[in-house]
Amino acid sequence: VYHVTYQYDKDLNNEIIAELNKVDGEFSMFNKQSTVTAFNNGKKVEASDMFMNVLTLSQDVSKDTYGAFDITVAPLVNAWGFGFKHQKMPDQQQVDSLKKLVGMQNIKVEKMNGKTYLSKKLKNMMLDFSAVAKGFGSDAVATVMRRHDIKNYMVEIGGEVATSGVSAQ
């Protein structure tokens, strides 16, 4: 769910939707065609500049927080029933086993012919960008606004907000 308001004489809805579709196509775990879904399903994926920018930012934040923020935590999240799989609470042995799947070191990065490819080092590890994707989507739509030299706008996606200027009200 998103809401965008801006002061401009043209309708930018199609451009906004196109930008949001790009973000969804990279980071949505609910989109069966997304890059992150392909990665999580065990495929080697070609990483776009957008994907690499968000991955690199996520790695930096993980490092800065000593691992408190980690986009590889999906197996643990799922074990507690917050993700796609709902099951009973994991016991300590399951938690210890799943913790081995968590960590940025489990992402294999290969550069070939000027392209970047990502794959898993461990079969059951997963990426989950849900902590950053909505904010990144808000920033991406804000970039559309700036590209059109729009000074006054508000972009809100799932509670993540990007603003500039003043309200028309």
Where is each model-derived feature located?
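Hydrophobic/aromatic-rich core segments of domains that either
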Residues: 151, 159-169
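Conserved residues at the C-terminal ends of beta-strands
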Residues: 156
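Penicillin-binding protein/beta-lactamase superfamily catalytic region
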Residues: 140
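Short, conserved phosphate/pyrophosphate- and ester-handling motifs at nucleotide-, phospho-/glycolipid
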Residues: 134
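A contiguous, well-ordered beta/alpha segment that forms the leading edge of an enzyme domain
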Residues: 1-130, 143-153
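Short active-site segment of divalent metal-dependent hydrolases/proteases
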Residues: 137
